[in-house]
Amino acid sequence: VKIGIDGDDMIIPHHAHYEIPSFLDGTIMTLADAPWPGLTPDLLSVLLVVATQARGSVLIHQKMFESRLFFVDKLIDMGAQIILCDPHRAVVVGQDHRITLRAGRMTSPDIRAGIALLIAALSATGTSRIDNIEQIDRGYQDIELRLNQLGAHITRTDD
């Protein structure tokens, strides 16, 4: 991924493909959370969803908290290629857009999983429905308004 810096802004231009590199000996990349200044654990769920659309495989290792990867079954139902190894580790096999995620109905179990499911729904074909959005609202104020301004098509319903 090519990244540009403009003052305090990080610019990520459009890429046709995102590739997850592997090591020379064939082992796959590992993304693991760590205390500051390491990778914040709140981003692992989002990175897991992004990896489903990349080319290559990655091991997501949630070291700091229990049971934060238990939402991956919903992504698997959407067509993602993910192997849940244990409560702390999941292997994502990115399909480089060859397999499009399918829309579905899901429930947001918490803030982090909720935003990850929302991102997955935005990349899916069809209309998805996410219940228990109060979880997402706790961490992301006016999220549908802000994403709609970027081109998303999100509608909040009362039922």
Describe these PLM feature segments.
Residues 1-159:
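Short, structured segments at the rim of ligand-binding sites
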